[in-house]
């Protein structure tokens, strides 16, 4: 049985010494009580030595985890001083004081950091106890004003655990109903399953009082009962009275005291030590299955985390080489999966992957950037008009000059360089993010990660430069030759016949299909109408609708997209909103939404706004183009030219440019993503798979590159310690035989027959610190002296006859509830009690019924026998 306590001590030491916090509540006994209640004295009596600090005020200022182990030699060990044995218990006391002051200071401060002390002695039973600070009311020294609450919280930190037994220490010379220890225990253990009562200072009670009712578990009963002890007095301590002599004096006190001699074998420090040993052993046995389950769960969690650490040896070069190869292979698979996409088991459902973001750049952002660079209709016609007139010069042209078409188209094609270069920059930026994410698993080796990122980034930058050259070369190809014989080109004949309401550049007939859904905020709603708030928007090729939420059941409004354009909204410096805003508006100035000229929409980030703009672009809503203002009357006169032949030529060139630019932009949107994929992304993937490892070996010393970071080494050691401690703990617990015999927990205390509040004068036992009732005058019998006079009442049951078989109290007269109450109080009180004997009230004697008189005679006779036996026993002892 004691091996169970030893096991828990080993677990406690293993976890504490390794610095492992396993979230396991190991079975222990916490000693709780008020200040100067005698807690430390009880612990010293267990050990048989003076080793705990003493003094006035609060002395125990840190929890002391005391492990008592039965051994051949007598010495102590502290967990914070490993390997040092303290043979002198005076040195142990000094070390406790010094260690307390190191953490809390020397001016009565407190701390919840425990001190672990293990005491080996042939005079102790295996126990694990926690000495906690005593409850105090007033702060002294540098203690905070809420010292009482802090101490309570510290105590609750230990006793609220279901695996902790509570040793509630209460002095006998105080009222048990006001016991701080029992009050705290009641809060966390209302059923009393874990609480053991200890009554100290029994020898200091007032003369004529005793704690028999408490020790017999009749006053404020506990499920595990009370045990009384007698500690050394302050005079004994100052006189260096040996604890063994004190234990002998304690035994003599209980054997000689008339109120305690009948239960002397169930009182005293040795009995308390045996009870605690048995109770703790049983408690450990009951909690071991749950402890094993927690350890197994911890083990399963730790096994996944330490799988890569199990066979790791920091000094082994082969293991480092293997680790490098494994991480490069992991990088290759992660990079490819991020770019190409992953299977259903590994797909990320929280955010877009790098490949998905690059896809959005190709098909949304590039299209949007190209359209932003295009001129609007009015600007384009003005440029065509200038080109035609400048080509003709002083001559009057009879035919539409094709050189004007070529000049305008080249200007439009040259504008494509900026958006395609920006597309390359966006892809490279996203690719750098992907590389950083994929190398995150190399964080254990910061130099390796840094070198890997440097090599890959350098290669990507080189490919970026090459890709930009090739893409600009594609634009130069378009500038070098105008293929007016293209099958999709409209031609001069069709251009002249085309109406001026021809399709605008880049438009597509999509039908009324849904293009995008998502949340946006309408910014320009008035305060009286609810202010800005988020809505669920549905964008189609013909309209945009918004709903209250994504269920799309309550539609707020539907806005047609015909003739609308986009513009950015700049937030003023007084604006409190940090959201990015854009607006839908009509170029002709009509109201767009109710009384509003524009509908202002906002998103959280710039990326979201740009994505929405690209979606609007697919629906045919283009960004606003700022018109350049010309100065002078010449510009006004040029723009107001009304030459019908020039207007026809402008319209023809306009249709030709529109048709040819559709071909060029279509080719550009198709070829740019292909060039980026081949020259950057696929090349980077091939580089990582085929050349990265060689560059790493050539870059420097692999031993330095594979040095662990301090954080990773600390975490690895901690994880391995936790894993080994958990594994050892499971092995220790697994070796325990669960066939041990334990005493069952006592049944719950039944006191429902007691009157509420114990206020009945016949049944109410006195408090330990109170004075028992003084004897009243002898009652006169109405039978003329047939019966002997009643003895004065002592207010308690009669003393027991020594060495009676069973050690219990004498048989009680029948008729009492449960047969376990003390005899009724004799008629010495002027209280109006009825049916007890002859009661004197207002000078008149009243007779007692015959049946009750017989019971009184029987009790009196038994009391006389007991007193005679006690006197005889003490005389010839």
From Swiss-Prot:
Miscellaneous information on this protein: Shibire mutation is the cause of temperature-sensitive paralysis. This is believed to be due to a reversible block of endocytosis, which prevents membrane cycling and thus depletes synaptic vesicles.
Entry protein name: Dynamin
PANTHER family registered for this protein in UniProt: DYNAMIN
Region entry G4 motif, spans: 200-203
Domain (GED) ranges: 650-741
Ranges of biased composition (kind: Acidic residues): 630-641
Subcellular location: Cytoplasm; Cytoplasm, Cytoskeleton
Enzyme class: hydrolase
Biased composition, class Pro residues, residue ranges: 788-826
Organism per entry: Drosophila melanogaster
Entry EC number(s): 3.6.5.5
Residues modified to Phosphoserine: 756, 764, 767
CDD domains in the cross-refs: DLP_1, PH_dynamin
